From Swiss-Prot:
Source organism (scientific name): Leptospira borgpetersenii serovar Hardjo-bovis (strain JB197)
Protein name: Large ribosomal subunit protein uL29
Region called Disordered, residue ranges: 66-94
GO biological process, one term: translation
Primary gene name: rpmC
Protein family membership: Belongs to the universal ribosomal protein uL29 family.
Entry keyword set: Ribonucleoprotein, Ribosomal protein
Matching NCBIfam families: L29
Biased composition (Basic residues): 73-94
GO molecular function, one term: structural constituent of ribosome
GO cellular component: cytosolic large ribosomal subunit
Length: 94
């Protein structure tokens, strides 16, 4: 399924596709790792790519609904470090 077709899917259909792809990945990994009966190991790679595409589309839709969510979600490493240092110094003082 191409990305253009994936973009046209509804949210519920995307969730169904994700569920199905995860099942395929789980069974493929089992067949490859334990049973050694997987004919084409490339199936694992392609399924992982499909899952990533579906998750990307899902995230893009979330950002369209809440455009400010992205800014509040991501903190740079320096900001996290500064925040943790402030919290630790407050514990030492208090």
């Amino acid at each position: 399924m191409k990305k253009i077709k994936l973009q046209e899917l509804k949210d519920s259909e995307i969730l169904e596709q994700l569920e199905e792809a995860r099942k395929v990945l789980r069974t493929s990994r089992f067949q490859y790792g334990v049973a050694r009966s997987l004919e084409n190991p490339k199936v694992i790679h392609n399924t992982k790519k499909k899952i990533a595409k579906l998750l990307t589309i899902q995230r893009e839709r979330q950002l369209k609904v809440n455009p400010g969510e992205r800014k509040s979600r991501v903190l740079s490493r320096a900001k996290r470090k500064k925040k943790n240092l402030a919290r630790l110094s407050a514990k030492v003082k208090g």
